[in-house]
Amino acid sequence: MEKPSAQVADNSKIINQLREAGINPTQQRIEIAQILLAQPQHMSAEQVLSQVNREQPLVSKATVYNTLGLFASKGLLREVIVDPSKIFYDSNTSPHQHFYNVDTGLLKDIDSTTVQIQHLPSLPEGTMADGVDIIIRLRNRQ
């Protein structure tokens, strides 16, 4: 079991991280941040909702979705859209790519040093590249 003093230190760190991002640290936002920002991981909104309400359901589905969107817009999380109906929230916001196993639903980071993009196509006039997302979709061998 985690010591109370360690929990207070973690809360202070999370609160400071939220404030530095310009986010008001409400209790629900702190709880969601503790789940997602504790370690590099990928979670869906449903997984976050389940985890945050594991002991006592206090956070609504709308609050989770709104908070995840806010965290992503402020750069605390990265949205990884593996298909139109499946979005993961990635606590690793540095540039990197992913493997997505369609059969298992597992999303895994790819070491960015192993992927090289040598040439991008010409961009439409008046635009600039904002990023390149690569998701390699996998299936298990039958």
Q: Where in the sequence are the language-model features?
A:
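A short acidic, leucine-rich amphipathic alpha-helix
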Residues: 47-53
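Short helix-capping/hinge SLiMs at alpha-helix to coil transitions
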Residues: 23, 37-40, 54-55
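Non-DNA-binding regulatory cores of transcription-related proteins
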Residues: 73-142
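Basic amphipathic alpha-helical segments that dock to polyanions
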Residues: 64-71
